[in-house]
């Protein structure tokens, strides 16, 4: 099978990268489309074919002309529609050639299936769903579904125009599937395949749980600085712990730098000695460090299913999460983790205090159940096979 993965960036997220490798190892021809953002030397070993959108002006023009000529020879019946549609949506000639590259590359690869990873791509490059002669799958993820169309009515209407043209949808949680249904994604076309972790993660597993009665509770959150991640409420909860004389250290591991409002809040609450912010750790380093923490908290307002939570559960790190998005699909309160209401720093502080007083036998039972949840339902091998079934499904 010739599989195209339209990710927009190469390399892409860890889950998608692992999916590419598994597809290739099963003998499928895999093409990945995007702008190169990092090293991809391992693609060659795995026979993964990167289709890179060039940045250089001359390269952009040359590639666009090459693609147009290829399609004039092999797909003459469609090229005029494609070029007209591309031209209508462009601001200038450079933008026209750039859009040609981003739209036409999948058309020359004779794909059996094109899997678009981000919902906004079907709006920005609608030709991919209107004219391509193969099955089109769209992944429904995070803010593209839960936030963007809610605050942007124009985007919501465009989703309603283009979602009905998609053959199948992949949702990372049932909650996102229900939300996407508001914009024209029919429920009978949606397959729910949760994010997953590679089974190699268990080599970092620490069977000896970190004791909670140590001098200082070591807490961690993982995720970029963005209002939807709820860090302001997490810091308010830390301020409550500080006021009550509870010893703790809270680390935020983020892919971007601290925002001004968070920095102001840190200073205003005088939390500088209690909080550490780490930027730019690779996922491998994050996984290595996770077992050193007593507790992971997810204070988000919206999530599909958090990869950081999956990794923590696999590594037997207890998790307190807000009951947002699809998190209650993985966490069962007091069974394999803990759920609290969103936007409630008092409840978060209370749950942390309950955790501190909890017996080690109870914590052991929680992390045992969390680890088993991952082994039963959230391993990458299972999800890759489910994804291939969507690709092969003739309906």
Question: What do these predicted regions represent?
Answer:
Residues 14-18, 217, 224-240, 260, ...:
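A conserved mid-protein helix/loop that constitutes part of the nucleotide-sugar donor-binding site
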Residues 34, 138-141, 156-204:
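Donor nucleotide-sugar binding/catalytic pocket of nucleotide-sugar-dependent glycosyltransferases
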Residues 222, 249-263, 279:
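Glycosyltransferase donor-sugar binding loop
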Residues 263-281:
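Nucleotide-activated donor-binding/catalytic signature segment of Leloir-type glycosyltransferases, i.e.
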Residues 301:
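Aromatic "clamp/platform" in nucleotide-sugar-dependent glycosyltransferases that forms part
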Residues 318-321:
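Short hydrophobic beta-strand element within catalytic cores of glycosyltransferases
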Residues 333-334, 338-345, 354-360:
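Conserved acidic donor-binding segment of nucleotide-sugar-dependent glycosyltransferases
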Residues 354, 361-377, 383-389:
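A short, well-ordered alpha-helix in the C-terminal region of glycosyltransferases
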């Amino acid at each position: 099978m010739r599989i195209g993965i339209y990710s927009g960036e190469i390399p892409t997220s860890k889950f998608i990268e692992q999916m590419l490798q598994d597809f290739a190892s099963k003998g499928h021809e895999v093409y990945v489309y995007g702008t190169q953002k990092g090293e991809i030397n391992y693609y060659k070993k795995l026979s993964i074919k990167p289709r890179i959108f060039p940045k250089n002006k001359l390269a952009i023009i040359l590639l666009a002309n090459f693609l147009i000529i290829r399609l004039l020879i092999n797909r003459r019946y469609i090229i005029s529609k494609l070029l007209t549609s591309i031209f209508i949506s462009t601001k200038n000639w450079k933008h026209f050639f750039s859009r040609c590259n981003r739209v036409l590359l999948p058309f020359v690869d004779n794909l059996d299936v094109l899997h678009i990873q981000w919902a906004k791509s079907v709006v920005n490059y609608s030709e991919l769903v209107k004219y391509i002669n193969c099955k089109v799958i769209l992944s429904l993820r995070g803010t593209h579904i839960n936030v963007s169309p809610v605050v942007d009515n124009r985007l919501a209407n465009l989703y309603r125009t283009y979602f009905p043209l998609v053959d199948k949808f992949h949702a990372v949680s049932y909650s996102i599937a229900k939300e996407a249904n508001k914009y024209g994604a029919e429920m009978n076309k949606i397959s729910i395949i949760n994010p997953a972790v590679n089974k190699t993660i268990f080599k970092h597993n620490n069977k000896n749980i970190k004791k909670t009665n140590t001098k200082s509770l070591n807490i961690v959150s993982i995720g970029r600085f963005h209002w939807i991640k709820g860090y302001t409420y997490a810091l308010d909860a830390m301020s409550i712990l500080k006021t009550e004389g509870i010893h703790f250290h809270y680390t935020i591991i983020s892919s971007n730098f601290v925002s001004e409002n968070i920095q102001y809040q840190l200073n205003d609450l005088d939390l500088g000695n209690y909080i550490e912010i780490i930027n730019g750790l690779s996922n491998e380093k994050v996984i290595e460090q996770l077992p050193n923490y007593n507790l992971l908290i997810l204070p988000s307002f919206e999530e599909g299913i958090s990869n950081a939570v999956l990794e923590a559960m696999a590594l037997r790190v207890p998790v307190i999460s807000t009951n947002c998005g699809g998190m209650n699909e993985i966490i069962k309160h007091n069974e394999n983790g803990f759920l609290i209401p969103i936007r409630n720093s008092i409840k978060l502080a209370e749950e942390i205090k309950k955790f501190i007083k909890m017996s080690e036998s109870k914590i052991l039972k929680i992390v045992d159940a969390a680890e088993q949840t991952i082994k039963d339902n959230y391993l990458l091998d299972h999800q890759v096979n489910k994804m291939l079934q969507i690709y092969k499904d003739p309906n």
